[in-house]
A protein has these predicted regions:
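Short, basic/aromatic beta-hairpin or loop at an interaction surface
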Residues: 65-75, 113-128
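Electropositive, beta-rich accessory/interaction domains or terminal extensions
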Residues: 1-106
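N-terminal small/polar loop signature for handling phosphorylated ligands or for N-terminal nucleophile
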Residues: 183, 189-223, 227-241
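Mid-chain, well-packed structural core segment of small domains
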Residues: 81-114, 244-265, 269
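Short alpha-helix capping/helix-loop boundary micro-motifs
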Residues: 77-80, 84-85, 128-137, 141
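Loop/turn positions that initiate beta-strands
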Residues: 89, 96, 136-144
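Proline/glycine-rich low-complexity loops and linkers
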Residues: 234-313
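Glycine-rich phosphate/diphosphate-binding loop of Rossmann-like nucleotide-binding domains
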Residues: 151-200
């Protein structure tokens, strides 16, 4: 069960110029480009900024003075959650607006920042967060936002005639599950894995893939059927459904492991994007599963950020 948190908006703040403090106002109007009459609004991934009073309190003690809301140039000052613990793609919503987190912290502007010039330090580069607008509306002090953590939904499909008939356990599929839990746990992203074990059947696989795309799964992993045998149909089915192929991932895996084991070069595995879903096709052996997942996890988050137009460089 994913826990949501209600946080309070304690101040809303705007400025007409970048690099200056923002001043509290009675309310703000949020459009698809950010806050009306605020210098940071625009068609980019940092349309507006948020900072929690929890950060204010810590910095006030270090600076030995009170810090006014908006002085860190945040648009929305909140209470009830350490905002820097949020992650890209988390959301803040209520009946009026919906915001999606795009960045945690930012580069410090040094002497061009008003607060830095005064006290020689700033909390925004480490503890401020940035968001884009998913739903336009108004916001004012006293409003409540619900924090909804991003949950990655993953479809795992193992294709095996014999395993689907119960002749042996799906060890490779179980190993992929372990890899996924270990990977996302380190980034503190919750995941839901929906698992299917089917025969090497093109129609069944196509149905599973179409359902995953229709239900907007973040990732699909297939296991098995990447060779050239008469029942190896996975790549043929997937290749017809992807909109954009990502050849470098699987090419690199084949070359790396094929150097010591030439049989690894025979895999036809592919990776790509089906609308809003990233898909990887893996071979069916446990050994190959470990090899492929070792390389795949190195770029998974960066890939999903790219697909959601989040600049994670």
């Amino acid at each position: 069960m994913i826990e949501t948190v209600d946080i309070e908006v304690v101040s809303v703040n705007v400025s007409l110029e970048k690099g200056t403090i923002k001043l509290p106002v009675n309310s703000i109007e949020i459009t698809e480009k950010g806050i009306v009459e605020d210098a940071h609004s625009g068609s980019w991934h940092r349309m507006l900024s948020l900072l929690g009073v929890e950060s204010f309190e810590r910095f006030s003690k270090l600076a030995n003075r009170n810090i006014a809301y908006g002085e860190f140039a945040e648009n929305i000052t909140t209470k009830g959650l350490e905002l820097f613990t949020c992650k890209p793609l988390d959301r803040f919503v209520n009946e009026h607006v919906a915001l999606e987190v795009t960045q945690i912290g930012k580069e410090c502007h040094g002497n061009s920042c008003a607060i830095y010039r005064e006290v020689g330090n700033c909390v925004m580069p480490k503890e401020g967060i940035f968001a884009r607008v998913l739903k336009s509306g108004s916001m004012k002090s006293g409003d409540v936002l619900q924090y909804i953590p991003k949950v990655f939904r993953i479809k795992l499909i193992t294709l095996s005639d014999r395993a689907s008939m119960g002749q042996y356990d799906d060890r490779s599929g179980n190993r992929i599950k372990e890899w996924l839990h270990e990977y996302f746990d380190q980034y503190k992203y919750p995941i839901i894995i929906d698992y299917s074990l089917i025969a090497d059947d093109a129609a069944m696989l196509r149905n599973e893939l179409n359902n995953a795309v229709e239900n907007i799964y973040d990732f699909v992993f297939t296991c098995g059927g990447t060779g050239i045998g008469p029942r190896d149909i996975t790549v043929d089915v997937v290749s017809k459904l992807i909109d954009k192929e990502i050849p470098g991932i699987m090419d690199q895996i084949r070359l790396k492991y094929g150097e010591n084991n030439p049989n690894a070069l025979l895999s036809r595995s592919i990776a790509g994007v089906m609308k809003n879903t990233i898909v990887y096709t893996l071979p069916g052996s446990v050994k190959a599963t470990n090899e492929y997942m070792t390389e795949i996890v190195k770029t998974m988050l960066h890939l999903v950020y790219m697909m959601h137009a989040i600049d994670a460089h």
